[in-house]
Amino acid sequence: MEKKTVTVKILGKTREYPMGITYAEIVKEYEGATKYPIVLVMKDGKLRELHKRLKQDGTLEFITTADEIGHKTYKRSAILLLLKALYNVAGHDKIKKAVIHYAVSSGYYVTVDGDVAITEDFLLKVKEYMLELVEKKIPVMKRSVGTDEAISLFHKHKMYDKENLFRYRRVSRVNIYSIEEFEDYFYGFMVHHTGYIKYFDLYPYDDGFVLQLPERKDPEIVPAFEPHQKIFQIGRAHV
C-alpha cells in the first residue's frame, strides 16, 4: 500500500503531514515560532527551498534571515527584486545591462549601462515599485533549463552579456529564477515569494547607486548608508 503520510521531527516534536506537502505549507504553521522569517528549511542536513515537497520521514530544521545562509538568500532575492523593478521602471529597451559590482557598506554597488539617468527621482520610482511587488507576495519561480535554452532566453530579454557568458560555459543545466515575466540566472537559493523582501533602501552613489540591505545581526533594520571612500575606491579598481 502506498504511504500517504510523512513523519518529521520539528523543534523537538514529531509531526505528521500528507505526503508531498510543500515546506511553505509547513512553515506557515510556525509563523511566530522564530524571531525572524523562515526562508529555507534543512531536511536531514540538506537545504531546501520552500517550494519543494516533503516526501520522506526525517528531521526538519528552520533557516531564518538571521542565519548565514538565510541572510545570503535574502540578499540574493533582493537583487532579483531590484533587477525586476529596474527593467520595469526604465523600460527593457533602455537598459543594455545592469551590473551588481561588489559589496559596499551593507549593500551592493550597482551601475546601469544604457539610456537611464540614475537620479533620486528615478530611484524613488524603483523603490516604490519594489514595495508594490513586496505587498503582492508574488511567487519567486525556479526552473532548470539547458544551456542552449538559457542562451536563447537571455537573447530574447536582450541580456547580451549573459547570453555571451553562457556561450562559453561548460554546464549542462542553468537555474533560472523569475518574478512574473522577469527572468534571470542565479546560483544559490531564493525566498519563496516577494513578501519576504521587505527591508532595503536605494541611495544614488558615484556613477550608480547602492542597494542597501540589513546586516545579518539585525535582519529587519536597514542601516543608513555610510560610504567608506577608501574601500569603495579599492572595489572600483577591480570592476
Go through each PLM region and give its residues.
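Auxiliary tRNA-acceptor-end handling modules of aminoacyl-tRNA synthetases
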Residues: 52-55, 59-73, 85, 94-105, ...
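Ubiquitin-like/PB1-type beta-grasp interaction modules and other compact soluble beta-rich domains
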Residues: 1-79, 84-104, 128-129
